[in-house]
Amino acid sequence: MTSTVTLFRNIVETATPFHRPVDVVLQRIKEGATKDLVKRIRAERNKTARNELKKGLPAICFSGTFNKRNDKSLVQHSGIICLDFDGYEKKKELISHKENLTKDPYVYSAFVSPSGNGLKVLVRVPADPDNHVNYFNALQKHFDSPHFDKT
């Protein structure tokens, strides 16, 4: 089953959504559709400047189709939760954790975040928006990682 997700031009543009199959979005990430900007983000040492650069990336809402970029504008849940794992001290640790996560039966996809210092992990869940937070909390317990971003 192909899930449809929502993209916005960037984090500031929240009114004009684009809807695409998740596999198309993942393929574009894999192919490096924004690789030049990602390289600039990863090279930038100043956190404020890096955050400004990140505002130029497309904003992806993996959890479903939305009319706008807020929870109340959910049209249909995709059956996907995007988890963030952050705070890795060393690149080797990040890569090792990514490899381990991809072996987990719940993980649909895992990739290095645009900053290069974290991971984005997609997990399939029932497409039930009423239980989205419950699934998130259960996944936090399942992965039991100090790098799991609880926000």
Give the role of each language-model region.
Residues 117-124:
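A generic structural motif
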Residues 1-79:
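DNA replication initiation on ssDNA origins
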Residues 109-115, 150-151:
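Short beta-strand
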Residues 80, 104, 118:
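Beta-strand-rich binding-surface signature
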Residues 2-15, 67-90, 125-151:
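DNA replication initiation modules
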Residues 88-106:
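Short amphipathic alpha-helix segments
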Residues 45-48, 101-105, 139-147:
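Hydrophobic, Leu/Ile/Phe/Ala-enriched alpha-helical segments that form helix-helix packing faces
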Residues 84, 111, 122:
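Residues in well-ordered beta-strands of folded domains
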